[in-house]
Regions:
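N-terminal hydrophobic targeting/anchoring segments and the immediately downstream early-domain regions
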Residues: 1-204, 261-393
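Active-site core of metal-dependent hydrolases
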Residues: 188-191, 196-273, 282-286
Length: 393
């Protein structure tokens, strides 16, 4: 099957493919991360949709790749599509261990692009997603508010909510407003690289997590209707955001630090804080490699790409073809933990583009595990839809 990939380092092309469902649809848009473990499995087909699964609104709280056919096979109705500038791993301390707090002020990550070019690249990415949705409007549509989500899902199409994966807004509220006008409805202050106004859990790790401008950004997001994502912010950034939040926030993709011992995952204290805002924590649905294994794989990959591709454009394109894949299952133990800590009304799921077709089995997995139908509906999407409706309008 022919596939076409898009990201901010690649201009829009005409994607055409004939799917296994016998319909012509655009196959993919977005990034394939080498830690995303994306796989397809022929076992999952539309004929196996359970009655309950079909009745639910199923939400993928964080996807780096939108594949229409795979979403349909997985029974997913709403996808939060993350995009942004590629970031590269440029420094690691000897024998670095992600369970050990990095030195304060350490810079380990950087985006491929800077300044006005970075903003332009983000605008290109938004345009690519809009073009993709327009080309396949019979199957997918961008949602800009809660009413859009309800309408699109009711029509039988997939609702796509655009998310800026890191707060690269050129230190400008005007740029934030511009991105909102173009359709961005979710934003993480920092992902891998710390921004000038917010620390990430991967580097810096210095109080305060938000500076004065960062606090202005959070307030502006609440005013214009951009849902704030704390998934990979530092503890300090999370605490500072939670201390001023007046609307629900989200963690679009995380595990639990009490289980993984990884600084990239959230502490119970932060999980409770997100719940206290009325927000939702989206558990990375699949199990997979340990954080240390991903950490070392990323470093090796980006060092090789930096050596082989001097041009950032070519390096970003090469990264797309470097996905590592392996099979995974629903991470029930982490879901149980977040339910205990934050409550059933504050738990969701996300794929990070991993094994989307397997979502068709999640309803049965959760019920067999002991959750009732009402609880399954909340976990699979009801909680995320509520938070989106309360924040983006």
């Amino acid at each position: 099957m022919k596939t076409t990939h898009f990201n901010i380092a690649k201009t829009y092309a005409e994607p055409v493919t004939t799917s296994r469902l016998g319909i012509e649809i655009g196959q993919k848009i977005g990034l394939i991360d080498a830690t995303a473990n994306y796989v397809t499995d022929g076992r999952f087909d539309i004929g196996k949709f359970s009655k309950l699964h079909r009745q639910l609104t199923v939400v993928d709280g964080y996807s780096a790749t939108v594949d229409i056919e795979e979403l349909m096979r997985g029974g997913i109705n709403v996808v939060v599509q993350a995009f942004g500038p590629e970031e590269e791993y440029v420094r690691s301390e000897p024998d670095s261990d992600p369970s050990i707090e990095p030195p304060r002020g350490l810079r380990s990550w950087r985006p491929y692009f800077e300044g006005t070019e970075l903003v332009e690249r983000i605008e290109i990415a938004i345009a690519e997603h809009q073009s993709f949705a327009k080309a396949y409007e019979d199957f997918i549509e961008i949602a800009e508010n809660g009413n859009d989500i309800s309408r699109i899902v009711a029509s039988g199409k997939i609702a796509m909510v655009l998310m800026l994966v890191s707060g690269f807004i050129a230190d400008s509220i005007a740029v934030l407003n511009r991105f909102h006008e173009l359709g961005v409805r979710v934003m993480c202050p920092s992902h891998l690289s710390a921004t000038s106004w917010a620390d990430s859990s991967a580097e810096l790790n210095d109080p305060p997590g938000l500076n004065d401008f960062g606090r202005e950004v959070i307030q502006a997001c609440e005013e214009i209707g951009v849902l704030v994502d704390l998934a990979h912010c530092s503890d300090y950034t999370c605490k500072d955001t939670l201390s001023i939040a007046t609307r629900p926030v989200i963690a679009t993709h995380t595990k639990v630090r009490n289980i993984t011992n990884s600084l990239r995952d959230m502490r119970d204290e932060i999980l409770r804080g997100v719940a206290d805002t009325g927000g939702v924590i989206c558990v990375l649905a699949p199990t997979g490699r340990t954080q240390q294994e991903r950490h070392l794989a990323r470093l090796s990959r980006d060092q090789i790409l930096t050596k082989n591709y001097a041009d950032p454009f070519e390096r970003a394109r090469a990264k797309l073809a470097n996905a590592q894949v392996w099979a995974t299952k629903l991470d029930l133990s982490t879901i149980d933990h977040v339910v205990r800590v934050a409550g059933i009304d504050h738990v969701g799921l996300s794929s990070h583009a991993q094994n989307v077709p397997q979502w068709i089995e999640f309803t049965e997995s959760l019920i067999t595990h002991g959750y009732d139908e009402r609880e399954v509906g909340k976990i699979l999407g009801g909680n995320v839809v509520r938070v989106l409706q309360e924040t983006i309008g």
